[in-house]
């Protein structure tokens, strides 16, 4: 079975507007400084606990538990207000499916958020969604991803993401990694993290996948 595994935030979906709003809701409610989307973009990628830890800074870490509660409450209601696929992503997923390549998402979002977001944005185009479970284990740990590949019998896999975390995740899963440059890390950051296959558009990702799985 051929399987293409995608990161979600910054790879398939531009979730940054809603993520920024949710972080800023927590920060503002606590009477703390808020952030621009560009600033939040550099905080995301390792789960919301890490994002909020970065947002709060060392001097405000006592607020972490409350910030997590506030952010989660807001995001549950607004996680798809402004979120949308990047241009060309839906067509890419449709073509992959037509070529007999199954699609999975491997995300640091909590499982319910990951499932709800994929269902709303992509319907049946993403049949396999793996988010963070109750144990709180996040990428770059590849345990949940490898469990999925074993469960569905995927023996040829390709990983695609937009961050250094994804490069490490693919390495831990022993999968080739396609790094996309339209997400929340710069090309320079990706190269410095060890990325060797870089694509600037979903069409380039599709072309690489078609050659890889040929």
Where are these regions (language model features)?
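N-terminal helical cap/lid subdomain that shapes the substrate entry/recognition surface
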Residues: 1-91, 99, 112
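Substrate-recognition element of Asp-dependent hydrolases with the DxDx(T/V) motif
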Residues: 92-119
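Substrate-recognition "cap/lid" segment bordering the active-site pocket of phosphatases
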Residues: 82-84, 110-160, 164-173, 187-189
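Short acidic-hydrophobic, aromatic-tinged amphipathic segments that line or gate anion-handling sites
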Residues: 197-201
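Nucleotide-sugar donor-binding loop of glycosyltransferases
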Residues: 181
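Glycine-rich phosphate-binding loop signature in dinucleotide/nucleotide-binding domains
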Residues: 99-101, 151-156, 212-214
């Amino acid at each position: 079975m051929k399987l293409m595994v995608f990161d979600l935030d910054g790879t398939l979906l531009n979730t940054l507007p809603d993520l920024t709003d949710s972080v800023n809701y927590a920060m503002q409610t606590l009477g703390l400084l808020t952030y621009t989307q560009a600033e939040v973009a550099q905080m995301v990628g390792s789960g919301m606990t890490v994002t909020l830890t970065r947002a709060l800074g060392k001097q405000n870490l006592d607020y972490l538990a409350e910030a997590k509660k506030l952010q989660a409450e807001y995001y549950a209601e607004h996680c798809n207000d402004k979120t949308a696929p990047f241009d060309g992503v839906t067509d890419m997923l449709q073509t992959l499916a037509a070529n007999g390549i199954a699609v999975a998402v491997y995300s640091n979002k909590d499982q319910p958020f990951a499932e709800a977001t994929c269902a709303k944005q992509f319907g049946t185009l993403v049949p396999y969604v793996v988010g963070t479970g109750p144990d709180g284990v996040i990428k770059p740990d590849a345990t949940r991803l490898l469990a999925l590949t074993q469960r569905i019998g995927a023996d040829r896999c390709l990983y695609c993401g937009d961050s250094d975390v994804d490069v490490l995740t693919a390495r831990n899963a022993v999968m080739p990694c396609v790094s996309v440059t339209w997400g929340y890390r710069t090309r320079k950051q990706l190269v410095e993290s060890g990325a060797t296959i870089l694509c600037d558009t979903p069409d380039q990702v599709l072309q690489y996948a078609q050659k890889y799985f040929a």
